[in-house]
Regions:
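Active-site micro-motifs of SAM-dependent methyltransferase domains
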Residues: 105, 123, 154
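Gly/Ser/Thr-rich beta-alpha loop segments that engage phosphate groups in nucleotides
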Residues: 65-69, 138, 159
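S-adenosyl-L-methionine-dependent methyltransferase catalytic module, highlighting the catalytic core
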Residues: 126-134, 140, 144-245
Length: 246
C-alpha cells in the first residue's frame, strides 16, 4: 500500500478534520473536499493493487447523495446510486449519471463495474452487510471495491448529535439533540443511524475471502496500526476503510 500510505499524511488528516464542522450548514464545502479525497484514495489504491488508472472506467458510487462525488469522477463513466428522491432533486440530479435504488438490492447485472465504492453509508442502513455483498456482486472480477464507514464508538459516531453524547447511548443523544435544537437530528438513531463496530466490519470483510486492506481513513499512515488492536480500534478508528477485490 505504498501509494495509499504516501497520501495519508498528517496534513491531510488535519485538513479533513477542519472540514467536518461544515457538514450540516455548508455541505458543499464538506462533501466536495471529501469527494476529492475519495478520488485520490481510489487512484492510490488502484495503483497499489496494480490495477489500470480508473479514467474512462466504470465507477459505481453507492449512496452518491447530492452529486458532489460526480464532480470528482467526471473523467470516468460514473453512476451514482441514491435511494432518496430529496437528495437527488436537491442537486438537480436526473437521467444520465444518477440512479434511484437500494444499496441492498443494486439494480445492476453481475460484474458490471470496474470500481464500486461507498463512503459513509453503511452506518445509515440496518442491513449494511447485504449492501457489501451487493457491491461485490456488481464489481467485475478483480475489480476494486471500497467500503468506508463511521465507527459507532469513534468520536464522530453520533454525527451531529455531538462528540460524547452517543457514548451514553444512541437514544439519549437523539433526544438530547431534539431538546437543545427544537427538532430531530437528520441522523436519527435506530432509523437513519445505526451502531456499526470496527470488529463487525473486519469480520465481515475477512469472511468474504476478498479483503485486500483495512485501515483508518482519516489517520496518517503512521497511526494505521490502531486498526489491528481490538477494543482500542473501536474508539480510535473514527472511519474504517475496507478494500476488497471483485
Amino acid at each position: 500500500m505504498h501509494h495509499t500510505r504516501r497520501m495519508a499524511t498528517l496534513r491531510r488528516s488535519l485538513r479533513l478534520l477542519r472540514s467536518f464542522p461544515y457538514e450540516q450548514f455548508r455541505p458543499r464545502v464538506f462533501y466536495s473536499s471529501l469527494a476529492r479525497d475519495t478520488r485520490m484514495l481510489i487512484d492510490a489504491l488502484a495503483n497499489d493493487l496494480s490495477l489500470p488508472p480508473i479514467t474512462n472506467h466504470s465507477v459505481l458510487d453507492v449512496g452518491g447523495g447530492p452529486g458532489y462525488f460526480a464532480e470528482a469522477f467526471a473523467d470516468c463513466f460514473y453512476v451514482g446510486l441514491e435511494p432518496s428522491v430529496s437528495e437527488l432533486s436537491a442537486a438537480g440530479l436526473s437521467g444520465f449519471g444518477s440512479v434511484r435504488g437500494d444499496g441492498a438490492a443494486l439494480p445492476f447485472a453481475d460484474d458490471s463495474f470496474d470500481v464500486v465504492y461507498s463512503s459513509n453509508v453503511a452506518e445509515h442502513i440496518p442491513n449494511w452487510q447485504t449492501m457489501g455483498e451487493e457491491m461485490l456482486r456488481v464489481a467485475k472480477p478483480g475489480g476494486l471495491v471500497v467500503l468506508s464507514y463511521t465507527v459507532w464508538l469513534g468520536p464522530f459516531g453520533g454525527h451531529e448529535t455531538g462528540l460524547w453524547q452517543h457514548y451514553v447511548g444512541g437514544e439519549y443523544a437523539r433526544h438530547r439533540y431534539a431538546k437543545v435544537h427544537g427538532h430531530e437530528p437528520k441522523n436519527r438513531f435506530g432509523e437513519t443511524l445505526f451502531a456499526v463496530s470496527a470488529r463487525e466490519g473486519l469480520e465481515w470483510a475477512e469472511a468474504t475471502g476478498r479483503l485486500a486492506a483495512a485501515f483508518p481513513r482519516y489517520h496518517p499512515a503512521w497511526a494505521w496500526w490502531v486498526t489491528r488492536v481490538p477494543v482500542l480500534r473501536e474508539f480510535a478508528v473514527s472511519n474504517l476503510v475496507l478494500v476488497l477485490r471483485g
